[in-house]
Amino acid sequence: AEHVIKQMERRHFNAYYCSTKEEALSKALSIIEKGSVIASGGSATIEEVGLLNYIKTHSEEYTFIDRSIAKNEEEKRQIHAKAILSDYYLMSTNAFTMDGQLVNIDGNGNRVSALCYGPKHVVIITGMNKLTPSVEDAYKRIRQDACPPNCVRLGLPTPCSKTGVCGDCMSASSICDLFVTTRMSRYPDRIHIIMVGEELGY
């Protein structure tokens, strides 16, 4: 982890390593200022760490833009638009590399767009199980190991949700529409990456 932290810092990311989920939660809360407006991309990792639940149950300390309350696609679109102006955007990354790059595949694009631009800060929590040797390996990992179980979790009728294997589909339900590699951050102190020494997410 020490090597990856150095590589990430070289890319103007703030990087940290925590041994456990509990440490990761504490670290994330030390980064997020009270009184902030917070939004989140869909993330099993953020939920597993307990960060999402903490933010939601401390409404006196934070304003949370909750996408789960959307009743239809238009409301969801408006909530995603508000998230772009949040103070802190919470997410995981689909993979990250030994040389410190972030690699993500997205469906709607709301998650990767927030990573690229908009929120003042992005807080990323990721398990060390998502570490890969290279960007090419990262994309392979995501399509082979992450997206099929994610489609099952989301109840999407994609070929991979049935077979467990990426079929390189063009399905309307595909979550593999946008491929984004984040090489560095133009703005220092914007992107915070918390690596956790546990298997988290997909």
Task: Tell where the protein language model's regions lie, with residue ranges.
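N-terminal active-site beta-alpha-beta segment that forms phosphate/nucleotide-binding
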Residues: 2-80, 85-90
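Conserved phosphate- and dinucleotide-binding cores of soluble alpha/beta proteins
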Residues: 84-202
